[in-house]
Amino acid sequence: MILQIRDAGVKLILAIVLYGTTLDGTTNFSHSYPFCGPSIGLCLEDEVLVGVLADPFRDELYFAAKGNGAYMNDLHNTGTPQKLSVTSVDTFHKALFSSGFPHDKESQMFKNMLERFIRLEYESHSIRKTGSAALSLAYVAAGRIDGYVASGLHSWDMAGGILIVEEAGGKVTDFEGHPYMMSNREWLISNGTLHDTLVELLKID
């Protein structure tokens, strides 16, 4: 949807975009591995306004609206929503991360991600490769993991979870620490406390 606004005689054209996927984690699903689910994000240009994720296997619904916090409830949203908050872990050796890789194993992006994975594995408590970007973001927001490092992703993989992480107190950027854009293919998500050190650790010359 295109929104047109006139401000002081100047017409501004803003794009409201709905990014989503009916199933994030398709490879998991194809192997009957129960870590996947739908994801949707409503964006104004590159700013996410509303994000919703679901984990049907654990009866969990994650949602956030800009400026109103992030919450988790059951899938029917019948219980009392639990407000989400990222961890306060501030040292790598105590931190648990999730990671995601590009599908093309011959690409430079894959090779760079593999180098980052090795660095992070040495420095952190451990890393998980979950196979679902959306639920990895939900787990950062819920304080179950401390960060998510991934390459090769698309806007529809990320849009639903970005705001949920931010509203829970986390941070979302590219690998250089720059503010994210929906066109990004490489993403760095953390509890915020670890973020600057993560950026330095994962730099590739």
Across the structure, where does each feature detected by a protein language model lie?
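N-terminal subdomain of lithium-sensitive/metallo-dependent phosphomonoesterases centered on the IMPase/IPPase/PAP
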Residues: M1-L23, K171, P179, T193-L194, ...
